[in-house]
Amino acid sequence: MDRAAKADLVASLNEVFSTTSLVVVAHYKGLTVADMQKLRRQMKQAGATVKVAKNRLANIALDGTNVASIKPLLKGPTLLAYSSDPVAAAKVAVDFAKGNDKLVILGGAMGATALNPDGVKALATLPSLDELRAKIVGLVQAPATKIAQVVNAPAAKLARVFGAYADTANKDEAA
C-alpha cells in the first residue's frame, strides 16, 4: 500500500469515525474467509459495516474524533464494526460472537462514551431505532383507535336495534 492509498484510507476512516454513532472493536483471529463474509453480509443487512484496517492507520484516523477512546483496543488482529444506528453493529457483532468463539468483542465507543465488552453486550439487547419508532407509532395510534371505537359504538348498537326491530316487523307481517 503506497502513501497515497494510506492517506485515502486514513481520510475515509476519519470520516467514518466522525459520522457514526457506534464503533465496535473485536478480535477476529482464526475466523475463516467464509465466516468473515457471513459477518459482513449480516452487518450489511442490519445497516452496519465491518472494516479491517491496519491498527496504526486506524489510530491516526481516530485523532480528533469522538470515538478516540477505542485507541487502546487496537492491538492485534482487530476489526471495526460501525453503524449510524446506535444498536445495529453491536447487535450483529454480539449475535455473531455467540455463534462463533473466534470473534471476541473487545469493546467500543458510542459517541464520546467508551464501552467495555459488557457495555457492548448490554447495548445489543436494546431495541433498534426502527423498533422504537414502531412502538411509538403504536402507542400514538392506540388511543385514536379506541376513541373511534367508542364514538362508533352507539351508532352500531342503534343499527342493531333497528335491524332487530325490522326483523320482528317482517315476521309479524309474514304471520
UniProtKB/Swiss-Prot annotation:
Q: Which domain of life is it from?
A: Bacteria
Is DNA repair one of the keywords? no
Annotated GO molecular function terms are: large ribosomal subunit rRNA binding; structural constituent of ribosome
GO CC annotation, single = large ribosomal subunit
Family annotation (Gene3D superfamilies): 3.30.70.1730, 6.10.250.290
Keyword annotations of the record? Ribonucleoprotein, Ribosomal protein, RNA-binding, rRNA-binding
Q: Which Pfam family name is an example for this entry? A: Ribosomal_L10
Its GO biological process annotations read:
translation
PANTHER family in the record, alphabetically?
A: 39S RIBOSOMAL PROTEIN L10, MITOCHONDRIAL (PTHR11560)
Subunit notes for this chain?
Part of the ribosomal stalk of the 50S ribosomal subunit. The N-terminus interacts with L11 and the large rRNA to form the base of the stalk. The C-terminus forms an elongated spine to which L12 dimers bind in a sequential fashion forming a multimeric L10(L12)X complex.
Q: What is the purpose of this protein?
A: Forms part of the ribosomal stalk, playing a central role in the interaction of the ribosome with GTP-bound translation factors.
The text of the family note is:
Belongs to the universal ribosomal protein uL10 family.
- Name this protein carries in UniProt: Large ribosomal subunit protein uL10
Q: Which species does this protein come from?
A: Methylobacterium sp. (strain 4-46)
